[in-house]
Amino acid sequence: MVDHLANTEINSQRIAAVENCFGASGQPLALPGRVLLGEGVLTKECRKKAKPRIFFLFNDILVYGSIVLSKRKYRSQHIIPLEEVTLEPLPETLQAKNRWMIKTAKKSFVVSAASTTERQEWISHIEECVRRQLLATGRQPTTEHAAPWIPDKATDICMRCTQTRFSALTRRHHCRKCGFVVCAECSRERFLLPRLSPKPLRVCSLCYRELAAQKRREEAKERFRGSPGQLTHLGSTMCGASSGDDDDSDEDREGSGDGDWPTQVEFYASGVSWSAFHS
């Protein structure tokens, strides 16, 4: 699937075309041995709503971005190393079909394809690439994954206190640990989550208590072992309450300018396959 395409002219041309579409805002993608295996449009469930995104499957990375002009211009490039990826198929419902979750240690999100066949093609190709990449690097599959953010529209009230009702004046926030939609009062705390960011992140009150308790247990074990020099003080990871706002709107900025795209139903109404895999 990979070897006969590596270092070929057609593969170089395909990768160069992807780089050109992202332009100066994207990172260089051409590397010795890297192969572009597939590409297509999937619907990504973002914080505000589901939006079409362009995806490119390479033998070692998964790349996706926002669509400005189909097959000509993309932006907001994201690169995910495949050895960090785990897939989770999601059950079908009347409102949501052909969905699966892409899980990594830093970010997890839900995507859907135009058809069951296309969904299965994406899943099988990604899983095969992940298997080969883990074999090549000798790494073990990732067992800890970031929680996917629950979409804003899923609830009108805080999912922790169940009392605060969201409005134009009372905004939603997301706990970076559990992904719940919470109010400002229920997410005043910050905690260092090294897998997600070098800076302390917003967490809900429940996750904060659990994380703080876990940290205290870890420090108690270190003290019991008699290794005070190796202690990481609780204060370095627990940052307490903060009235300042953090970045809750990556997807909103990423998706700005998508207003010209049709809704999810219209986008897939033609029944045309929006993905292609190279062999």
Swiss-Prot record:
Zn-finger region bounds: FYVE-type: 152-212
Cysteine pairs bridged by disulfides in the record: none
Bias (Acidic residues) ranges:
244-253
Where does the record place the PH domain?
Answer: 35-131
Q: Name one GO cellular component term.
A: early endosome
* Cited function: May induce apoptosis through the lysosomal-mitochondrial pathway. Translocates to the lysosome initiating the permeabilization of lysosomal membrane (LMP) and resulting in the release of CTSD and CTSL to the cytoplasm. Triggers the caspase-independent apoptosis by altering mitochondrial membrane permeabilization (MMP) resulting in the release of PDCD8.
Could you tell me what this protein is called? Answer: Pleckstrin homology domain-containing family F member 1
Q: What gene is behind this protein?
A: Plekhf1
